[in-house]
Swiss-Prot record:
Record function comment: Heme-binding protein which promotes neuronal but not astrocyte differentiation.
Lineage: Eukaryota, Metazoa, Chordata, Craniata, Vertebrata
GO biological process annotation, one example: nervous system development
Domain comment as written in the entry: The cytochrome b5 heme-binding domain was proven to bind heme, although it lacks the conserved iron-binding His residues at position 82 and 124.
Pfam families: Cyt-b5 (PF00173)
Annotated protein name in UniProt: Neuferricin
InterPro entries: Cyt_B5-like_heme/steroid-bd (IPR001199), Cyt_B5-like_heme/steroid_sf (IPR036400), MAPR/NEUFC/NENF-like (IPR050577)
UniProt signal peptide: 1-22
Organism: Xenopus tropicalis (Western clawed frog)
Gene Ontology CC terms: extracellular region
Length: 273
């Protein structure tokens, strides 16, 4: 009991020191790693880009922090990844949200501007944010693009959240679409590519195999290989008794692969096809 009271008193002292001197726990000797969660202030800390930049894990650094979508995390326990020489060291001391999706780890790419990311990319970025929230200590917020000087969300953050919501809806739509048109299996060689269908292709278990077809995305020239049910009524009319027993083959978004037998469950494609 006395030990618990002593810890509570120490934590309270740390909070008072922070409020008087405006210092984070990691800057108070002996406290930063003793009670990191117990002593964490509910409102969090507001940091500028300049303040965050000194938490890069380098010589004389105060620790290892990074930010994603304006939220700051202490990633010290992952120092082998985020510290100097680590595979993710370029994320330390900054908000490089865009680079998580683009893979551009140059100075130009390690930025927090996410306005050009697609809804699905933003959804994946949000998954990264959730990962840090679940695995690392939240320090506070980074003022600038996503939070103002008072810690309130900016229009940029509101816009980002709207795009994430669109991404979530697209993901749900894609999951439903995949049930009707599961992705093909595929493998590559130096000269060709093989696509084929099975009762578990695309990770979608079903009682039919189907045949490979190109499925185009509305309004674009892009397509993906899907497996199409080639018997019974179309999916849009499952109870129809008046059909030509072609399943979903007549869907207008589908096209046959050239030089492939349309009845086969597999197809060899030249690279670039």
């Amino acid at each position: 009991m006395l030990g618990y009271l002593a810890a509570a008193a120490l934590c309270l002292a740390a909070v008072l020191l922070m409020r008087l001197d405006h210092l984070p726990l990691v800057d108070i000797p002996g406290l930063g790693y003793i009670f990191p969660q117990q002593c964490e202030l509910s409102e969090g800390r507001l940091m500028s880009k300049e303040e965050l930049s000194v938490y890069d894990g380098g010589p004389g650094s105060s620790g290892i922090y990074l930010a994603i979508l304006g939220q700051v995390f202490d990633v010290h326990k992952g120092s082998k990844h985020y510290g100097p020489g680590g595979s993710y060291s370029f994320f330390a001391g900054k908000d490089a949200s865009r680079a998580y999706m683009t893979g551009d780890f140059t100075e130009k790419g390690l930025v927090d501007d996410v306005t050009e990311l697609s809804p699905l990319q933003m959804l994946h970025l949000h998954n990264w944010l959730s990962f840090y929230q679940q695995n690392y200590i939240t320090i506070g917020k980074l003022t600038g693009r996503f939070y103002d000087e008072s810690g309130n969300p900016t229009k940029a953050l509101e816009d980002a959240l709207k795009v994430i919501d669109i991404g979530l809806k697209l993901k749900e739509e894609r999951e439903e679409e995949n049930k009707q048109f599961p992705p093909c299996n595929s493998e590559w060689s130096s000269e060709s590519k093989r696509v084929w269908c099975s009762k578990n292709s695309g990770g979608i278990q079903r009682d039919w195999v189907g045949v490979p077809r190109k499925m185009y995305t509305a309004g674009t020239n892009g397509y993906r290989c899907v497996c199409v049910r080639n018997f019974g009524p179309p999916s849009e009319q499952p109870d129809s008794t008046e059909h030509n027993d072609r399943g979903d083959l007549d869907n207008p978004m589908l096209h046959e692969y050239e030089d492939c037998n349309p009845l086969f469950e597999w197809c060899f494609l030249k690279n670039g096809t």
